[in-house]
Amino acid sequence: MHLPTLSPRRLAGAAAAACAAALIPVAALGTTASPTAPATAASPPGCPTAGLVVWMNNEQGTAGTFYSDLNFTNLSGHACTLRGHPGVSAVSLGGGQLGQPAAWPSATLRTVTLANGATATAVLAITDVGVFPPGACHQVTAAGLRVYPPNQFTSKRVPYPFGACTTGRVFMRVDPVHKL
């Protein structure tokens, strides 16, 4: 009895054909008719910095800390979303950063969908830097805040004079955004 010899090239081709033939019934099983899930609407895009007005209100003070609402109003002309903590730092009149940026406390993050004209807010806490020893803070008056909306790389400046530390201590904390 004489068996034909196959070259490695022919052997590989035959193996590929056999595998393909074996997979055809398996592929057919995967395409059995089944009800499809209803299509879900895509969520609105993230809010671009250029489409937001950033402003503050509701300042209240207790035991050495001032709390304010840091607000984000969507004026982009369409719905958009915010999720997470804004980036916040004190700035000089010339726009230079003063001291450390605001800390982000651990918190549950929620996606906030803003219709055009709607506002989301984040609570900003600023420590009265007068409570720190003079050498631990190097206090100056900030001209305002540089604010990066969550997940954005472009900032807005918010005029807001307040006492800031130029070195050392973290003196601000900002919560994640939530619906107003």
Predicted segment positions?
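N-terminal export and membrane-targeting signals
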Residues: 2-19
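Intrinsically disordered, low-complexity Pro/Gly/Ser/Thr-rich segments with frequent PxxP/GP/PP motifs
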Residues: 103-130
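Short, solvent-exposed loop/turn segments enriched in Ser/Thr/Gly
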Residues: 63-69, 139-142
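Terminal connector regions
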Residues: 129-170
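C-terminal region of N-terminal signal peptides and the immediate post-cleavage residues
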Residues: 24-46
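Low-complexity, acidic Ser/Thr/Pro/Gly-rich terminal tails and inter-domain linkers that flank the onset
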Residues: 39-62
